[in-house]
Amino acid sequence: MKAVLAKRVHSGRADLTEFRELAAAAGYEIVGEITQTRAEDTAHHFGQGKVTEIAELVARTDAETAIIDNEVGPYQMFNIGRILPGETEVLDRFTLILTIFGQRAQTRKAQLQVELAELRYQLPRASAKTSLAKRDERPGFMVLGDY
């Protein structure tokens, strides 16, 4: 599978060497890399322009996955996914490492432990995605109820 790597650092130079090796170990073909040096944006993790640049690179290279070498919050992941083209999958470093563990788990117990870790990690992301997707459906001002 083709993947684009992206990394944001607060200051200094972004080094993607280890991250590149992790992506290759998970079976991804790296077709592009983008780095950004700046403070974290609360909405998109990267700046809005950089997310657009990632989307253009994904479209140009026909990548199926964008992998971010940072811990990305559930709302940030959702916002990035909305900007990327089509059904582009967005992964962060933690998910990538879980993917590698899942591919290499030999025993049933190890496979179940990896699956449990994945589900625990995905729960707040699924909740955030549902909340954001249903935000416009809440009728009225200050309506009670949570998704």
Question: Where do the language-model regions lie?
Answer:
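Flexible nucleotide-interacting loop at or near the entrance of a catalytic core
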Residues: 108-147
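N-terminal accessory targeting/assembly segments
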Residues: 1-99
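Short amphipathic alpha-helical patches
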Residues: 46, 57, 81, 103-106, ...
